[in-house]
Amino acid sequence: MGARASVLSGGELDKWEKIRLRPGGKKQYKLKHIVWASRELERFAVNPGLLETSEGCRQILGQLQPSLQTGSEELRSLYNTIAVLYCVHQRIDVKDTKEALDKIEEEQNKSKKKAQQAAADTGNNSQVSQNYPIVQNLQGQMVHQAISPRTLNAWVKVVEEKAFSPEVIPMFSALSEGATPQDLNTMLNTVGGHQAAMQMLKETINEEAAEWDRLHPVHAGPIAPGQMREPRGSDIAGTTSTLQEQIGWMTHNPPIPVGEIYKRWIILGLNKIVRMYSPTSILDIRQGPKEPFRDYVDRFYKTLRAEQASQEVKNWMTETLLVQNANPDCKTILKALGPGATLEEMMTACQGVGGPGHKARVLAEAMSQVTNPATIMIQKGNFRNQRKTVKCFNCGKEGHIAKNCRAPRKKGCWKCGKEGHQMKDCTERQANFLREDLAFPQGKAREFSSEQTRANSPTRRELQVWGRDNNSLSEAGADRQGTVSFSFPQITLWQRPLVTIKIGGQLKEALLDTGADDTVLEEMNLPGRWKPKMIGGIGGFIKVRQYDQILIEICGHKAIGTVLVGPTPVNIIGRNLLTQIGCTLNFPISPIETVPVKLKPGMDGPKVKQWPLTEEKIKALVEICTEMEKEGKISKIGPENPYNTPVFAIKKKDSTKWRKLVDFRELNKRTQDFWEVQLGIPHPAGLKQKKSVTVLDVGDAYFSVPLDKDFRKYTAFTIPSINNETPGIRYQYNVLPQGWKGSPAIFQCSMTKILEPFRKQNPDIVIYQYMDDLYVGSDLEIGQHRTKIEELRQHLLRWGFTTPDKKHQKEPPFLWMGYELHPDKWTVQPIVLPEKDSWTVNDIQKLVGKLNWASQIYAGIKVRQLCKLLRGTKALTEVVPLTEEAELELAENREILKEPVHGVYYDPSKDLIAEIQKQGQGQWTYQIYQEPFKNLKTGKYARMKGAHTNDVKQLTEAVQKIATESIVIWGKTPKFKLPIQKETWEAWWTEYWQATWIPEWEFVNTPPLVKLWYQLEKEPIIGAETFYVDGAANRETKLGKAGYVTDRGRQKVVPLTDTTNQKTELQAIHLALQDSGLEVNIVTDSQYALGIIQAQPDKSESELVSQIIEQLIKKEKVYLAWVPAHKGIGGNEQVDGLVSAGIRKVLFLDGIDKAQEEHEKYHSNWRAMASDFNLPPVVAKEIVASCDKCQLKGEAMHGQVDCSPGIWQLDCTHLEGKVILVAVHVASGYIEAEVIPAETGQETAYFLLKLAGRWPVKTVHTDNGSNFTSTTVKAACWWAGIKQEFGIPYNPQSQGVIESMNKELKKIIGQVRDQAEHLKTAVQMAVFIHNFKRKGGIGGYSAGERIVDIIATDIQTKELQKQITKIQNFRVYYRDSRDPVWKGPAKLLWKGEGAVVIQDNSDIKVVPRRKAKIIRDYGKQMAGDDCVASRQDED
C-alpha cells in the first residue's frame, strides 16, 4: 500500500484529490484509484513502478492506446486514470478526466506535426519550390510553365461531359493546382462557349474584385525601392497585371497568392453555376423501389455537393436523410446497423438489395433448384467398351458412390430432393431425357418473337428451331450460316421441350433431345420394311425396329430420316432429324437490358388522330407492318390503348418501294429529355493512319434494340381502311422506333456496352462508332485483320445485330460518315452543286449545307452572300432571286470544287499548325496541317458576334473557334500563323478591356494583313476645334434633333424624323466629323455612342455607324471625351438647349448641381444620388468617380448578412488616440457610434442602455474585451433583458459585420473630417451619412430606411401570423363553375369581400364568395364506447 501511495508526493496528492471523475460531477479521484491502477497494471504484466514518473505514464499510455477500440470498459477506465496521473506529474492544470484526455490528445497531435514537419523538411531540402507551374530554372530565376494542352483538354471534356454538375468544382480545383491568374483565364476561355455560365462567373469575379479593393485600399505615396505594388482586384483576375507581376507576387517574401485568391473567386462562381445547373434539392433524392443502393448513394452525394450549406449541415444531412430517404428494404437493413455506421458498412450491407442484380440473384436461386443435375440418358448405337464415370448422389462429386461418401448425409431423396422418402422409394424413376427435373406440367411449344424474348426473358437456355423453308431437307452444313429467318419457334428449357409431330399420318407428342443420336418412338405401325436392332439406354438395352426414309413433320418443318420403334418410356426426336430442320441448342448471353423511359412529369401520351391516306399508301403500310409483326418489331393492340400517332408512307429515293414514316413530333414533346451520349461526329483528320481498315454498317440498327415494355403503349399507331370499310389496324412498337427522340441515345448507349468486351480483348484495334456506322482500323496484316472483323461480326450477331455484306466495305476507298477514306488520305464524298434557273429558300438551305460540308477540306469556300438571301421569315417554297454578289460567290465556289482536294491523317509525333487568311467582308479561311501543303483539314469563319466589330476582334474569335475544334479532334491546340503584326495586336489589346486568351502565335505576311484603320487619341488635341455634340428625340412622335456647338462659335442643328435618342447622338457625332478638319476633339454625353466608337469597329451592320467609321478613317487625329450632361464645359449647355427645344420632356440636368452639392457635403454613394435626384446611374457614378476622396476605393456593400431583427454587434475602434464605441444592427447595417472617454465597463453599459432605449435590442454580440465581459455590462444586459454573446470559434454570429463597419465608418470620417473641429462631431456626421446618405444592399434602401422597414415588417408578420393561425381553423366547401356537386373541405388561406383563396390538396384556387361555404373545423369526432357504431358492432 505504502509503495503504491508513494506514486504522488503530498502537494501532487492534494491536486489529484481535487480532480473530478466526470465534468460537473461530485465524485473526485482518491488514493484508492491509484492502488486499483497499479493492481490492474500487474494483471497486464506492466511494471507499476512506471506510475511514479510522467515519462513512465506516457509509456503506459502508448501501450494502452492501440487497444482502446476493442478493449473493455475496465481498460478505458485504466487509460483515463493514468492520463489524469500524467497531467498531475506534468503540472498541467485539469479539472476533470475529459479535460485531461483533451490535453493528452493535444500533446500527441503536436508531436505528430513536429515529426511530419521534420520529415517534410528533410525531404524538401533539395527542392526550391513545389508551386506548379512556377519553377526555378538553372539560373535561380522563377519562371512560368504554361498550362499544358492536355490539362486544358481534360478541363474541356469535364465541362462538356458533366455540364456544370457538382463534379466540375473538385476537377477544376485539381487541374488548376498552383496555377497563375493567366492560366486560370486560359482555362475559362477554353469553355467560353457556355455564355450564360461564363456571364454568371464574370459577375461573381467582378463582385469579389470590388470587395478586395474595398478591403485592401491603395497606400498613398510612392512604392519603396525593391518593393512590389500591391495587387488590385483586377490584377488578381489577370486583367490588368502581367504574367511577370503575377509570378512576382506569388514568389515574393511574404507571398501574395494571387492564383489561389482568384481560384477561390472562380470556385465561388462555379458554386452558383452548379446550383443553377443542378436545381434538384437534397430533400427530393429518394431511392426508387428497385434502384440499387449504390446508384442512390451516387445521386445523393452528387446533389449534396451542389447544396449551398456548411459542412456541419451536410454531415447532418448525410447522417439523417441518407437513411430516411432509402427504400423500405434498404432502410430496414440500415437501421439495424445502428447510428454510427460508416458509408462502407452501409454499402456492403445493402449490396444487391433491389434492382436488377437482386432480381438476377433470386432468379439464379430459382434456376439452381430447377436445374439440379439429374440422371442422364445417353442414347448411342453401340455401348460396347463404354466406361461410365461414377458420381456420388450425396455430395455430387465424381470418383465415388454415395455408400462410400464421407460427407454429411443430405436430407431427403437424392433423386428429386424432396423430404419424406429415400431415392429407392422415389416415384420419379423414369428416364429423364431432358436432363432437367419435371418442374412444369407438359405444354405446347410457344411462338416467341426474337424481340419479345430478348426484351422480356432473363438469362436463359433455349432450344431454337432455326427455320429456312419447309422443303429444305438437306443436312445442315456451312451453307446455312448466313441468312436466318427471325420467325422461328424458341422453346425455353424451363419445361420439357415437348412438341407435336406428324408421322405416318398420325399426330404424336415427342421430346426434342439434342443429346440423343437416334429418333425413337413408342409402338406404332409404319409403312415399309424394317430391320431389328438393340439400343442402350439408362434402364438397360431395348429391342427396336429400324425404319429408313420415313417422312416426319416437326414444327411445320419436314424431314426424312431413320426412325426406331420400340418400348421407349417417351418419344424422342434425336439429332439425326433435328439437324435437318436446323434446330440448335443456344446458350445466349444476357439480352440487351431495356432502358427505362418515362414521359415528362404531368404529361400523358399522344392522342393525335390519323389523317386519311390513299389506297396505295394503305396497301404499302399493311404489307410493311405485316412483315414487321412477323419479325417481332411491332405487335397488334386492341381498343384499350387510348394513344395514337399518325403514320404515312413515302416512296424511297430512285425506287418503287414504299417507306413507312411515323410522325412522332407529339410524342417527342411529351417524352423525357435524354443526354446525348456523343457530343459530335468523329472527324477523319483525327484518325491515325492504319495498315488495314474496314467499314461496317449495322443493319436495322434501331430495330435490334428493345423498347421499355411500359413505354410501348405510347408508340401506338393506326393503319386506316379505305372509306372506313373496317376499323383501323392498331399496332405498337416493341423496338426503338425511327424518328422518336430517345432512339439515338438509347441505341448509342446499348452499342457502347456491347462493343466494350471486344474493345478490352483487342486493345490494338481502333473502333470508331457513330450510330450504326463502324470504322475498324488496325496495324495487323490483312488476313489477321479480316479474322478479327469476323470475330467482331459474330460478337455483334450474338446480341442480335447484323452487319449486312451489302454494306461491309473491305477495300478502299471507304465511304464513312459522308467522307471518302483512302489508305493515306481522305476527302469528302463527291459534291455536285445543282444548276437551277430559279432558287427556293429550301434549295439555298441545301446548297449552303453542301458548301459548309465541303469547306472542311476545300479551302476558300464562302457562303456569306448566299446566307444573306435567307434573312427574315420566309416560306420554304418561296422563290428567292440571287443577288449579283451571291451569283459571284456561287461561281467562285463551283471553281473551287472542280479540282478534287484531299486531306491527310494525323501523326501524333508532329506539331499542329493552323494558318488563317482574311477573305474580306468579314469572312476568314483557315488550314490545319503538320507538313506544309498537306492539310489535315480546312475551314471557314464568318460569324459576327456583335452589330459592330473589327478585324482584330473577329480574328480572335476565329482563333478561339479553331483552338476549341482542335482540342475536340486532337486533344491539343495548334501553333497559329496569323496575318497581323505584333504592334497592331498590342495597340488594340492594351486598350481593350476584356481579357481574352490567345494561344501561341506568330506573324505571317499573307495579304491582306489585319490592321487598325484608325486610332483614338488618349489626350485632347491642342489647337484642334472642339465640337460639343448632343441629340434628343421624342418617344411618342419619333421626331428628333441632332447638333453641335464648337469652341470657335460655330453651331448647327438638323431636324430628324423616325429616330431614337441613341440614333440622334450618333447622328450628332457624324455631323461633327463631316464638318471638322483633319484633327478634331469631340465631347458627347452619350455612353452608348462612346461605347461603340471606343471599341474601334471597322465594319457594322448599322448604316449610320458605317458612315461614322468612314469619316474616322479619313481623319488624322480624333479625340473623343464623355462628360456627365455637359457639366462644367461651357459650350455643352448651349448645344443641349439647341437640341432639347420642343423635344425633351424631362431633363435631369437640374438635379446634377444639387447632387454634386450634396456629395461634396455627405459623399453619398451613387445609388443614393440616383434615387434622390432622379439621375441616370451613369451620371451619378461619374460624380462619385470625379470626387478625389471617393475614387480611392470601391464602395461598401450593405445588408449582405441576413440575421434576426433584434441582433446587434458592438466593438471598440480607435482613431486619433480616442476610443469610438460602435454598434451595428446586423440585419440592416444601421450604425450607432459615440466617442467614449475610456474603454471601461461603466461607459459601455451606459452606451448599451441608451441603445436599448432607442431600438428593440434582443441580443448583443461582442468580442472578449474586458469592458464587454465586465459585471457592469452583464448587469445592464440582465436589467434590459438582453442576451449577451461573445466571439467564440464556430459561432455563426462572427464579428465580421462590425469589423467591416468600423472600416467603413473610418473611411467616411476621413471624407468629412475637414468639415468638423472635433472628432466626436465628425463621428456623428459620419453616422448620419452612413445611415441616411448611402443606399444599396437589400431592397436598395439606406441603412436608416432598412432598419425601420425590418422592425415594422417584424411586427406586421407577427400579427399576421396570429391571424393566419386563427384563419386556418376554418374549412371551406365550394362549387366549381359548372359542376353542381359541393367539393371540399379545403383549407381557408384568405377571405376577401368578393372571393376566398383556398387550398385543396396541393392546388391553390380563388373561389367567388357566393360559391363557398365557410365552417369552423372542430376536429374529427371519435366514436366512444357507448356510441351507435360500437353498439352495431356488438350486434
UniProtKB/Swiss-Prot annotation:
SMART domains: ZnF_C2HC (SM00343). Residues 8-43 are annotated as: Interaction with host CALM1. The keyword Lipoprotein applies. The record marks 132-133, 363-364, 377-378, 432-433, 440-441, 488-489, 587-588, 1027-1028, 1147-1148 as: Cleavage. Residues 814-822 are annotated as: RT 'primer grip'. Residues 7-31 are annotated as: Interaction with Gp41. Residues 508-577 form the Peptidase A2 domain. PANTHER family: ENDOGENOUS RETROVIRUS GROUP K MEMBER POL PROTEIN (PTHR41694), RNA-DIRECTED DNA POLYMERASE-RELATED (PTHR41694:SF3). HIV-1 lineages are divided in three main groups, M (for Major), O (for Outlier), and N (for New, or Non-M, Non-O). The vast majority of strains found worldwide belong to the group M. Group O seems to be endemic to and largely confined to Cameroon and neighboring countries in West Central Africa, where these viruses represent a small minority of HIV-1 strains. The group N is represented by a limited number of isolates from Cameroonian persons. The group M is further subdivided in 9 clades or subtypes (A to D, F to H, J and K). Residues 12-19 are annotated as: Interaction with host AP3D1. It comes from Human immunodeficiency virus type 1 group M subtype B (isolate NY5) (HIV-1). Protease: The viral protease is inhibited by many synthetic protease inhibitors (PIs), such as amprenavir, atazanavir, indinavir, loprinavir, nelfinavir, ritonavir and saquinavir. Use of protease inhibitors in tritherapy regimens permit more ambitious therapeutic strategies. Reverse transcriptase/ribonuclease H: RT can be inhibited either by nucleoside RT inhibitors (NRTIs) or by non nucleoside RT inhibitors (NNRTIs). A zinc finger (Integrase-type) spans 1150-1191. This is Gag-Pol polyprotein. The lineage of its organism: Viruses, Riboviria, Pararnavirae, Artverviricota, Revtraviricetes. Mg(2+) 3 binds at residues 1211, 1263, 1299.
